Design a protein with these regions (language model features):
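Charged, often Cys/His-bearing segments associated with DNA-binding zinc-finger transcription factors
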Residues: 1-69, 123
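Alpha-helix N-cap/N′ positions at the starts of helices
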Residues: 34, 75-78
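Generic hydrophobic, aliphatic-rich segments that mediate packing or membrane embedding
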Residues: 46-49, 53, 71, 79, ...
Length: 287
């Protein structure tokens, strides 16, 4: 027994000094990214746009210096915003935590902080045009897009369409009908994301509350966008593709191929104005 006790008292080789990770400065980290042009690939925006966004959110994302005095120090607001943007771009939480040497648990907390800051910022909120001044401003953008010589789309304020956003198929405990999320058109599982944007790719209405099997017309209705569009004062309207029903406030293309000259011309300019929603989706999903 004494021998056994003595064995427990034998100390192992002395442990080395604890290595403390240092947190890299934001400006130091992004310098090579700016120089080689990969900053936008990483954060989905130019450095100047990042600074502008950070200036809007600074009071909400900057760290508490008193709470960050120990261990690796406080996480600077730029790192919080950067991690949030990387996560929103589809990167895993490990990639979001990589730069500032954050533990994954810390990274989750900082991404949540960044998301809350974005959602609480009034200047970033999706806003539907209501006043005459706002409507005229939106219409001016589409007049500019419609033609260099003759502004055909004089009173258009938006263009709408649907996008399938891929998700992991829910189980029966999460949704009573998991198969409803399968889109036969796209052959994948997702949610139907309805969006209306202006001529400058700014989203003015968005909703993602219907399963992927829902057609665009029904998803548009369940989002409440049909009532929203119909509430537009005359003569303003929105553009949509053939999946939506035609009304005085929702202009869709003429169906079929055997169209007369006037109908064909209308479809051309209607399609020209509707390009902005496709480009908006492209901006959303590109990396």
């Amino acid at each position: 027994m004494a021998t056994l006790a003595a064995g427990f008292l034998i100390l192992p080789t002395r442990r080395g000094e604890c290595t403390q990770r240092s947190r890299q400065e934001w400006e130091e980290m992004i310098k090579p990214l700016v120089e080689d042009g990969t900053f936008k690939t990483r954060y989905r925006m130019e450095p100047g746009e990042f600074k502008q966004l950070y200036s809007m959110l600074r009071n909400r994302v900057d760290g508490d210096v008193k709470k960050g005095l120990g261990h690796n120090g406080t996480v600077a607001g730029e790192w919080v915003l950067g991690a949030t943007l990387r996560w929103l771009a589809g990167h895993g939480i490990s990639a979001a935590a990589d730069g500032p040497n954050m533990a994954e648990s810390t990274a989750y907390a900082k991404v949540k902080k960044g998301l809350d800051a974005i959602n609480q910022c009034g200047r970033l909120r999706i806003k539907w045009p209501k006043t005459e001044r706002e409507l005229r401003k939106k219409a001016k953008g589409f007049r500019r897009r419609s033609s260099q010589l003759v502004p055909v789309l004089k009173h258009c304020v938006g263009a709408g369409d649907g996008l399938l956003v891929r998700i992991k198929k829910p189980n029966v405990n999460e949704h009573p009908c998991p198969d409803r999320f399968f889109s036969g058109h796209k052959m994948t599982v997702g949610m139907n994301y309805q969006v209306i944007c202006d001529a400058d790719y700014i989203v003015i209405a968005a909703c993602c509350n219907t399963p992927g099997s829902t057609n665009d017309r029904q998803a548009f209705k369940e989002a409440g966008f049909d009532n929203l569009v119909e509430s537009l004062p005359a003569p303003y309207y929105v553009l949509g593709d053939a999946a939506y029903g035609a009304t005085n406030k929702m202009l869709v293309p003429y169906p079929g191929c055997n169209l007369d000259a006037d109908q064909d011309a209308f479809n051309f300019f209607q399609s020209q104005g509707r390009m902005c929603i496709e480009q908006t989706f492209g901006i959303m999903v590109s990396e």
